[in-house]
């Protein structure tokens, strides 16, 4: 089965898009650019200002709010198109043959191993701290396609970034509801999502 891939990218950033397109074409990976909300575009000022009025919006920069909005629009797109599982990448992520093989061997039987209330991180946790503070279980793991995802069992609150993750549409719908009920939050407020029982467990493999 084909696993849909969203790449969040500013429409005006042509040079970066061209580089991404070259890499994915070379690896023969299908993907779709998803136009990110541009915080520098005056047309987005109204929606950004509105998001600032709830939750922790007042503490966030325009760029952080725009990032949150971009990911939430992807969640809505997953729901609208009935996409069960999708990979969401930001345009600074580095992909390689390991990522290609993960996609190549991902099929229906692999999908059945995934749980809707778990978040599967495809990397992006290296270089965030001075030392490896995320502890991963040696025993609680799941082999999906060619990759082994291990449960994060220590310092879950240190998980950051939204650069590469695999998510189910049920979780996407719950995150949109969280915005409606709680208000604005950062796109990578994984701790908050865990506290609201939207994410049960985090599984990580640096793909």
Which residues are covered by each model-predicted region?
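An acidic/histidine-cluster motif and surrounding catalytic segment
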Residues: 1-89, 93-207
